[in-house]
Amino acid sequence: MKELEILLNRRWILKSEDKELYYRVRDAVGEIRKYVTDKLGCQIIDNSLLIKLEKIPVIPEQFMGIGQFSSKEEYVYLCILLMFLEDKDAQEQFILSQLTEYMTAVMPGEITDWTLYNNRRKLIRVLRYTVEQGMVRVTDGTDDVFMDDALSLIHIS
């Protein structure tokens, strides 16, 4: 059950970052799945890219937020970014203009003005968070360039 402890302590196990651990946990998922479903009420998500124990709290607490985020808009941007990534294949590249066009099209309420520094800064915080979490990789350019109103190339992990 060492693998269960690993799943409890980590957000996810990415195959691209640790193949040995990914396959070790994947081999044990059959035993773990029944236990966590029956006893903990959790689900295990496993696919060709990652293994994750879905740990959703019954009552959310203040400390459970994302420390880098300072506004509700950043959480909205993250959700829309995740929607955008769902339509992409692993390792597929995109440029920030594609993302901002998508976000503008699906954003609830008023249209986001990407010429405003504050809006670009919030998106950069979200992108930096997704890079830290291994969801995307920057392959060309920097996020600082985007804040100065230019384009960068992003790579989906």
Across the structure, where does each feature detected by a protein language model lie?
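Eukaryotic partner-binding/assembly regions in large regulatory complexes
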Residues: M1-G67
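Short capping segments at the starts of secondary-structure elements
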Residues: K2-L8, K88-I95
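A cross-kingdom feature marking solvent-exposed beta-strand/loop segments within repeated
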Residues: E17, I59-I66, A105-K122, G141-M147
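Short amphipathic alpha-helical interaction segments
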Residues: A28, L116-Y129
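Positively charged, polyanion-binding regions of nucleic-acid-associated proteins
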Residues: E73-Q93
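Short acidic, hydrophobic short linear motifs in intrinsically disordered regions
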Residues: A90-E110
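A short, conserved structural fragment
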Residues: V131-G141
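Conserved small/polar residues in nucleotide/adenosyl-binding loops
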Residues: I154-I156
